[in-house]
């Protein structure tokens, strides 16, 4: 990507975040175009894309035949097809899997590195962007297109915007916001996604979890009414037979080192510690606190105490901004 990522700063929790413009280079864009785009995606992802309007974006999962997610995709309509945003570390293998059946359909599936992904969040983010765009997305209209630019609106953990933009316009936007906004990289957006309870699937965890183990059903990412898609049988079984015993949790506290994606944690059991869970993502905030996104059993006690393996510090469960009650 020719657009240079902004230098990193220690991320800040949403409640204290000043106006911040971020380069989202740890995320990547991909597209599907052609006459069969909608039909093809409908047979591949967990969401009902046939019901998606131009004004919506959805978090959907792309699964293998066993219902395990290759990746999750932030999906929106783009031109005559769809575009989606996923972690850069999983894009290549995810596209390889998605293309496996494409020979029989009128579709073109490709990575898109021509466009740049930017995030805007923090204090008065809407006011800052209102000076630069004629219309901004909102709860009622979550996707807005202006020329070659697409803006996506997110409510959690606090109002923020993801901008899909060409390089020249990205440079112009950066110049206009440079004076009033702090600049940061993907880690700040990652911290906000962890706080929002949006599952982060990197390469280490690709092919490991069914969508419900990462709360996708609570985020509107699974349709149980649509027709067949790859992995549907296992995803449906997890719902209707209660086969899913896992959930995504948010932990916060201290740790002398950041756990990596794919690593386990330890749960305090009386005087002992027992290994548990799988870390999806973790970030250290500027106040020294650590936030960890982890998949664990869905019946954890709310006052459970955790730690990074063999660490002296502890982590505790924080509430997510959505309910898992069905």
From Swiss-Prot:
The keyword Transferase does not apply. It is found in: Cytoplasm. One of its GO terms (cellular component) is cytoplasm. Disulfide bonds: none annotated. Folate binds at residues 27, 189. The keyword Membrane does not apply. Keywords: Cytoplasm, Folate-binding, tRNA processing. Pfam families: GCV_T (PF01571), YgfZ_barrel (PF21130). It comes from the Bacteria. GO terms for biological process: iron-sulfur cluster assembly; RNA modification; tRNA processing. One of its GO terms (molecular function) is folic acid binding. Folate-binding protein involved in regulating the level of ATP-DnaA and in the modification of some tRNAs. It is probably a key factor in regulatory networks that act via tRNA modification, such as initiation of chromosomal replication. Belongs to the tRNA-modifying YgfZ family. This is tRNA-modifying protein YgfZ. It comes from Escherichia coli O127:H6 (strain E2348/69 / EPEC). The lineage of its organism: Bacteria, Pseudomonadati, Pseudomonadota, Gammaproteobacteria, Enterobacterales.
